[in-house]
């Protein structure tokens, strides 16, 4: 199968995808209601899209093509409200969070769609264990070579995105010690991790053809990379974030990525090399394990600093681009998180410490989702 043609798109436009938990309102465990939600929203008018995901206990919402923080907020609120209304009719709850705090993966039911059934057959129990919930952000790119340059430039900032969005400290009734335990589920897939270091689309097409010829992949969807090109959309897709507990946080993180993209592609501050990935896995682990308190190592200088410090330094550098894009309010929120060194994982742990009940913690997640 040939690689899709890269459709050039308007630079720095963006789209947001959020995978949402569907829970019952009795004990706030995951419940099978995605099909019923899809039925209820038929005929509703809203921006973007709502689609089923791999199990009946999750559903995905996505914006249209956004230009600004204000537009993203407006669309996310509108889609969220449609889903909440439908959920109320079914007496089920919706919430963010990268993992459900106490669900048992073996209870999950794969959604009845050909691709999801194929994934279940291919990956076995991993498909049900993949009931985790992420935020994906697409960034428009003017041409395919720029997309690859942006992909590898953006990889340096993966720890930022993980730490800011982290909202999955609990798995199957246990505090994992991680801020983002969700990504540990992604690691199990053979084509996860980072994209190969190629900087021209011709070289990428050659790589893709070789992979297809091995019989390992059929399309770009088979790659579970942290960032991957999406040629049919003319974007790169950043895929490492947990779903935040509110759409406001999701919009702020998306606009941080948008502003970074403008800085990286316009100013070209980085000289890219394969050596940029020497500390990639280490930095990624630190973000998952320790959140904003984690350490990140500069691959070129060896300098070590906390992820929070690196974010604050980055915000200073990209400030002119925030002004141009109208994303100052979003970046102010990002800066406040970095200064306080708190994220949604911190909030979840605080609630659990107070309530001593994961059921109550999930109930409060549902309330946060409505804010």
UniProtKB/Swiss-Prot annotation:
The keyword Oxidoreductase is annotated on this UniProt entry: no
The protein's name in its UniProt record: Putative glutamate--cysteine ligase 2
GO terms, biological process: modified amino acid biosynthetic process
Coiled-coil regions, chain positions: none
NCBIfam families according to UniProt: gshA_cyan_rel, PRK13516.1
Substrates-to-products reaction catalysed: L-cysteine + L-glutamate + ATP = gamma-L-glutamyl-L-cysteine + ADP + phosphate + H(+)
Matching HAMAP family: Glu_cys_ligase_2
InterPro entries, A to Z: GCL_type2/YbdK_subfam, GCS2, Gln_synth/guanido_kin_cat_dom, YbdK
């Amino acid at each position: 199968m040939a690689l899709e043609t890269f459709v050039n798109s308007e630079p720095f436009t963006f789209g947001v995808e959020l995978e949402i938990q569907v829970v019952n309102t009795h004990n706030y465990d995951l419940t099978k209601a995605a099909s019923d939600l899809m039925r209820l929203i038929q005929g509703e008018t809203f921006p973007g899209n709502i689609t089923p995901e791999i199990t009946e206990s999750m559903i995905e919402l996505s914006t249209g093509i956004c230009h600004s923080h204000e537009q993203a907020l407006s669309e996310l609120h509108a889609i969220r409200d449609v889903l909440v209304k439908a959920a109320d009719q079914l007496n089920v709850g919706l919430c963010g969070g990268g993992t459900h705090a106490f669900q048992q993966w073996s209870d999950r039911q794969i959604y009845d769609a050909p691709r999801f059934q194929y994934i279940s057959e291919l990956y076995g129990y991993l498909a049900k264990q993949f009931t985790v919930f992420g935020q994906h952000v697409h960034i428009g790119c003017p041409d395919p070579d720029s997309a690859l340059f942006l992909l590898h430039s953006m990889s340096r900032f993966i720890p930022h995105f993980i730490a800011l969005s982290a909202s999955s400290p609990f798995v199957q009734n246990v505090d994992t010690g991680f801020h983002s335990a969700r990504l540990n589920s992604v690691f199990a897939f053979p084509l996860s991790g980072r994209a190969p270091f190629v900087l021209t689309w011709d070289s990428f097409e050659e790589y893709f053809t070789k992979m297809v010829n091995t019989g390992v992949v059929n399309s770009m969807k088979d790659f579970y990379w942290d960032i991957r090109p999406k040629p049919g959309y003319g974007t790169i897709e950043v895929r490492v974030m947990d779903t935040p507990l509110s759409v406001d946080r999701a919009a702020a993180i998306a606009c941080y990525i948008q502003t970074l993209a403008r800085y990286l592609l316009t100013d070209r501050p980085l000289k890219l090399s394969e050596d940029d990935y020497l500390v990639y896995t280490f930095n990624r682990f630190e973000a998952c394990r320790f959140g904003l308190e984690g350490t990140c190592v500069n691959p070129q200088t060896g300098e070590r600093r906390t992820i929070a410090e690196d974010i604050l330094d980055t915000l200073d550098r990209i400030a002119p681009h925030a002004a141009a894009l109208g994303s100052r309010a979003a970046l102010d929120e990002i800066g406040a998180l970095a200064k306080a060194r708190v994220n949604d994982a911190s909030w979840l742990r605080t609630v659990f410490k107070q309530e001593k009940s994961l059921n109550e913690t999930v109930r409060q997640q549902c309330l946060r989702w409505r804010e």
